[in-house]
Amino acid sequence: MNARDLLATALLLSLLGCATTPVPTSTARDVPRTRVLNATLLERKEGLGQVVVKRDEGLAASACNSRVFANGTPVAEIAPGEKVTFYLPEGEQMLAAMATGICIGGLVEAKASVSRSRPAVFRISYGSSGEFSIQPTAF
């Protein structure tokens, strides 16, 4: 192994060890309309609860978007530092996220308890070992 190969390997390993950082909901940017895949879910309607899904910031997978699903229906593709706000019926709902492009991650899911009284807030993140996840957050 020559010095160039060693440097490339070290760089790759250092990137894999970078965890992403939560973004406060108040500072996360709204996903652009061009990446909204189902605009009807973004409409606030009587009897529905608010769901916010945001994508962490950080070096890990920063070149890729994440596709957000609600009960199997695509909602939007969000980039790091962005959020999508949509509305679902009250009760247990399934959210999912899938890494797009060249990024690893596959499809991950989480149950959301949706209520009209408070938003259900979730984050999409990469851990320090490269694991891709969607989970509830207080940030």
Annotate each language-model stretch with its function.
Residues 1-19:
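Sec-dependent bacterial lipoprotein signal peptides
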